[in-house]
């Protein structure tokens, strides 16, 4: 029996349901994996230039469809379209980069050894690689995973995050339109048990995950038990350090801009700010001034001084709970920290300990 869990696309601006998707069935998963495995046997024999041709077509289609792609993620996870457009820029660059450099990266390397001989390092394709992708950069993260894997002669099966199925679907359609062989890039709507099944299947040779520490531990454990190659990119706790020699208004604006991008939902965003004591109060005042000036914005019509919805209403309400715990532990909220309206808008907050 197949798992019939459903994914609902909820517009974070309005919280309205726009579309519903269902998980792939067990039979469909087997068919997808079988097709990917057969495609790998042909794709691995392609020259680097033949592989590069497909990647360049994918890059061009991303470029051609940038407005549509940016609107999809604006409606799906609240990202402002100008930021979505910037994400597409990165995707185009990544696919073209690996198309241009894949042959160099994949070339045999001759390495002199200490006995006067020569060792040869030969790079060969692995096979079917499974990618478990996050929602916060739904195109960029897929490109970082898929482009080098495909250029190296592998095929990929991508399980995207539950809240961005339209983005996932759009990527697969681009590969189809680029003339990629069926099974080269496969999008799957799948549950945890189905991903476990893939990891433990002999036809799958590797898995890559970008996500939480908990998910990483689970994937790494399963991959280790199955002796599969595993790549993990997990979260960070980046600090923004402010010295007393700084221009305080400029430093506060930079810190704010780095924190507010993608509504703060990025692993590279500064999670905390460490400020030298003699400028601490002035720096906090500057941040509060900036935060207080921001008002709700429409992700489809971005403007300076606007903040946009979180990825979902649940995500916004989770932040409220985090702030509640912080206050209980002694933190002070200077401004913001509330969910407003029907959607997933969370007023920008400044808290200190």
Segments (PLM) and residue ranges:
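A general structural signal for well-ordered alpha-helical segments in protein cores
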Residues: 33, 55, 70, 91-92, ...
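Structural signal for hydrophobic packing residues in well-ordered secondary-structure cores
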Residues: 40, 44, 59-66, 70, ...
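N-terminal Rossmann-like NAD(P)+-binding subdomain of aldehyde/semialdehyde dehydrogenases
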Residues: 1-117, 293
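Rossmann-like NAD(P) dinucleotide-binding subdomain of oxidoreductase/dehydrogenase enzymes
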Residues: 109-250
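ALDH superfamily catalytic-core signature
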Residues: 18, 214-353
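Residue-level signal for inorganic ion chemistry
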Residues: 15, 51, 73, 95, ...
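Short amphipathic alpha-helical coupling segments at ligand-binding clamshell hinges
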Residues: 50, 54, 58, 69, ...
């Amino acid at each position: 029996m197949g798992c019939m869990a459903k994914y609902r696309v909820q517009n974070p601006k309005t919280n309205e349901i726009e579309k519903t998707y269902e998980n792939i069935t067990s039979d469909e998963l087997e068919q997808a994996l079988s097709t990917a495995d057969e495609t790998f046997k042909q794709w691995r024999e392609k020259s680097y230039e033949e592989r590069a041709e497909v990647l360049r077509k994918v890059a061009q289609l991303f470029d051609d469809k940038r407005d549509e792609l940016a609107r999809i993620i604006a409606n799906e996870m609240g990202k402002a379209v100008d930021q979505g457009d910037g994400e597409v820029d990165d995707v185009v660059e990544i696919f073209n980069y690996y198309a241009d450099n894949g042959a160099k990266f994949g070339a045999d390397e001759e390495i002199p050894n200490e006995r006067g001989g020569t060792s040869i390092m030969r790079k060969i394709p692995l096979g079917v690689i499974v990618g478990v992708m996050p929602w916060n950069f739904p195109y960029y993260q897929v490109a970082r995973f898929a482009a080098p894997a495909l250029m190296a002669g592998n095929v990929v099966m991508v399980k995207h995050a539950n809240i961005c199925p339209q983005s996932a679907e759009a990527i697969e359609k681009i590969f189809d339109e680029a003339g990629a062989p069926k099974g080269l890039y496969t999008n799957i709507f799948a549950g945890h048990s189905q991903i476990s099944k893939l990891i433990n299947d002999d036809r799958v040779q590797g898995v890559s995950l970008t996500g939480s520490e908990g998910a990483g531990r689970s994937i790494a454990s399963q991959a280790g038990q199955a002796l599969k190659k595993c790549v993990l990119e997990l979260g960070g706790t980046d600090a923004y350090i402010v010295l007393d020699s700084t221009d305080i208004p400029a430093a506060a604006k930079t810190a704010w801009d780095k924190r507010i991008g993608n509504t703060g939902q990025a692993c590279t965003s500064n999670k905390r700010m460490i400020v030298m004591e003699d400028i601490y109060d002035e720096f906090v005042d500057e941040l509060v001034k900036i935060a207080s000036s921001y008002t709700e914005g429409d992700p489809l019509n971005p403007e300076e001084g606007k903040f946009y919805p979180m990825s979902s209403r649940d995500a916004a309400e989770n932040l409220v709970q985090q702030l509640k715990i912080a206050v209980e532990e002694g933190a002070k909220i200077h401004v913001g920290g509330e969910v407003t309206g029907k959607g997933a808008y969370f007023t920008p907050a400044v808290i200190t300990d």
